[in-house]
Amino acid sequence: MLIKVPTAVRLYSVKRTPIKPFKEVLKRIQPSNTELSEKSKKNNIPEWKKQIISVKKKIGNERWSPSKRLSREEIESVRLLKRSFANITNTELSERFKVSPEAIRRILKSNWEPNDEEWEKVQKRWQRRGERIKELYANGGNISSNGHQVVENLVPHKKVIISSGRHMNTFDVIEKKVRSTKPTISIKDQKLKDKKLKLLEISATKR
């Protein structure tokens, strides 16, 4: 019998992974006491502290400055809603007032309320703002006794409500109508028109 011998034999080298010690394997399977204690600490942290940690992670070293701020009236209404409906959450209130839940949390946390002197200052400030708005739109027309601006050929566009918590003034912000972009008659055409009209007048007088 003839046995065929292969011309080229490929040799494969098998890499052997080093055997890891038993302690390392145990570490991967079972967490250490320190890891367990850290996890238990995290679980035992109260909700208010978790909230502070999450806010610090989001903001970092920056100062708290929300893009939208609620007025004094809106802040009071937030507090009133929370007192009336204890089960209402911060997220629900934030959706209602279009602010972040963190802003609602800070409003409910703070106990500051303005006294009579501060209320007077706020009212004066809003009065000054109202006067400024009246001056701004005084050029467009006259302002009636009820605080509304009366202007000819103008259309009401927006409404600005100025409130100090106790008094409220409403001003209509008004803008002019946009002129239509129709093609204007040229000077030559106008002259020809005038000539034709003159000729017609002359012919009418002759008759």
UniProtKB/Swiss-Prot annotation:
Its main location: mitochondrion. This is Required for respiratory growth protein 9, mitochondrial. Residues 1-12 form a transit peptide. Keywords: Mitochondrion, Transit peptide. One of its GO terms (cellular component) is mitochondrion. Disulfide bonds: none annotated. Pfam families: Neugrin. One of its GO terms (biological process) is mitochondrial genome maintenance. The keyword Transcription does not apply.
